[in-house]
Amino acid sequence: MLDFYADWCVSCKEMESFTFSDPRVRAQLDGMLLLQADVTANSDADRALLKRFSLFGPPGTIFFDAQGREIRGLRVIGYQNPERFLRTLSLATAP
């Protein structure tokens, strides 16, 4: 899972405070490889990374399969509450 984050991003803060901190979400994330791209500086490299994944800005969460291919249709753009994010995680981890 690749999560795009920035300190100035209000929705990113909501994801951290409400969704990623939820014990049910944490349990589902256990065992997954979690990466966070901090694009706070909005540098050329940050913008290039966002562009590479066709994102306008954070927050954005992208899921990959065991072979490193993006799981199409499961991107999370913007804030998702814990219940909705759990449904997304279930789809991402389905066999």
Task: Briefly describe each language-model feature range.
Residues 13-14, 47, 73-75:
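Short, solvent-exposed loop/turn and secondary-structure capping segments
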Residues 1-9:
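Short active-site neighborhood of thiol/selenol oxidoreductases, capturing the structured segment around
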Residues 19-24, 56-95:
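Non-catalytic, surface beta->alpha helical segment in thiol-disulfide oxidoreductase systems
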Residues 11-30:
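Typically the conserved alpha-helix immediately C-terminal to a functionally engaged Cys/Sec
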Residues 44-57:
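Structural alpha/beta surface segment adjacent to cysteine/selenocysteine redox centers
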